[in-house]
């Protein structure tokens, strides 16, 4: 009876469209996300102009305050808000509506996140937390900054548990069925988030008493290691969110089918199981780890490239099949048959193309010797503006063109489509300039996280100026892109004509093989992930704790 | 059969001299990475042996009990500090390690597991986590160096590795009690 009621509920949900209360939750998340993007982007522009020597920042809002806010707002807050909003809408659509309890958890998580952001931003503006988004000790921020971080993590936890509850309840009601693929991605992404947040939670709980002055010293290396177990993982979570849209929605948009349900689920499992120990590739130059250990972590880190390569294979196979179905001939004829003038395809497609150089750069810099050349230079900033600032963010933008009209029961107009194409091109060109310049000038030695200086007119430093000028041009284009995108999002939300927009979910091929049952064994995968994490972390952590030097007192370098 | 080929590749890779040298240079990697990988290589190769010698398995391991006992004996043997030392200093023992872990632990484990009753599986989970817990205590608490080849701090590291392994197995076991897989299928 219960089951029958629920299938009816799901059917009505699919034909009538989204549940109004679920839509309100997601729209709230997305509105705040794009407001945050606007602020973060404006700060980015200020940084770009400063670095080119075109703009001097006032003392009361200096470069490092802005940089901290830019990093936290964009890499942590914008992405988190987007992920929760997008996945809650996905659950609502594919599982027949959110459970009332889970919807409430979504609102609680929102409250926690907003509280956290208020704490963090206030302390940054007051000039008491210019510690960058990595908040490495022994630099010490106000304790309220760290307390804000606790709220942010708590928000992630509450929203994640909500996802698990909704998925488990669906599974109970639908015995023998596989969780729909998009919800499966949501579960995987939140499992990875929770696993990744364990280390940083421990770190922040050590930093808070230190920041209040209750403990005198802090173990610097331990903190950095715990931070990167999170920092690395969370970026891969954002990537997984983007990948979910590539697998599930993009094939539908181009009139193709799902390539392989099993392969997609395998990618999720591999991402969850292998990811967390990858954090060490951010510490290749750190002292305190033996050479042999660092060498072994190169493999750990490269193994994460495996699911990415599988994804690339999968996507190109889908494109080729879709193109051939439309009558494409020859080796590359399918390429022309793709709907290039549809922004819902163009944006994620450019996102995927950007991942080719981005992934190659990542594989390069995870090698010890190559890392020494680019470590802490602007190269690294160029790298993650490609991976995160382009691959992930452009995919998020691409989702907006159908998700918002779907939620508000409106339709995207051809005008907005055209504007979206312009936005995508502006973003791509802006990033080409900014990230390209950052990569190049980084190899020439220009450091990251350093406001404009010529080092007393040193010749080498002066030689960076032309590249930094290109960086500023790219940054200005990007800010134009931000303005366009924010305009598009709010236009779609409030002014687009009423109508019906579908939530694009690709169907499997007619002759698709059945998905094996082992993909649903989350109990096993979580345990395997914990085992892999302990294999990666036990050795260095025990060493860092047992052989620790005396801890460090706090420093305020700004 | 593809699996068996992967298993063989992994097996050979693990025995390459630079790989063994690196893996054995760190105590925790020696015991918690190299040795389990040998077992996994054996598990991957199992289908090959099952196809080649079907009678052997049905005759000697019909209910899975002999296989799992053999597995436990081999695993216990390699958990002793002394055997690790000998593997490093006596070539014959090193070769025994290369043979015993895949073929006398990995193969019987995979052949037995499907045949075992739930009750026996539960006993295995509990005893493995208990043994690992004991090893954790031994390696963390021992004031003496237990292996000639490894320092005390490495020993403690290994002990903490055992804490996590014991916890993993135990949590998995608890999870099987509470989450009935068939309920979700
Ligand atoms: C208008 C667009 C953007 C511009 C102009 C911009 C520009 C910059 C610049 C100039 C830096 C500082 C380089 C340094 O001194 O080290 C920076 C850092 C950074 N950006 Fe952006 N960016 C933009 C968008 C984004 C986006 C969309 C993201 C991520 C979603 C992002 C994430 C970051 C992060 C994480 C840092 C590092 C902060 C740190 O080193 O602590 N940025 N950005
Ligand atoms: Cu990383």
Where are these regions (language model features)?
Chain B
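Alpha-helical membrane segments of multi-pass proteins
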Residues: 1-185
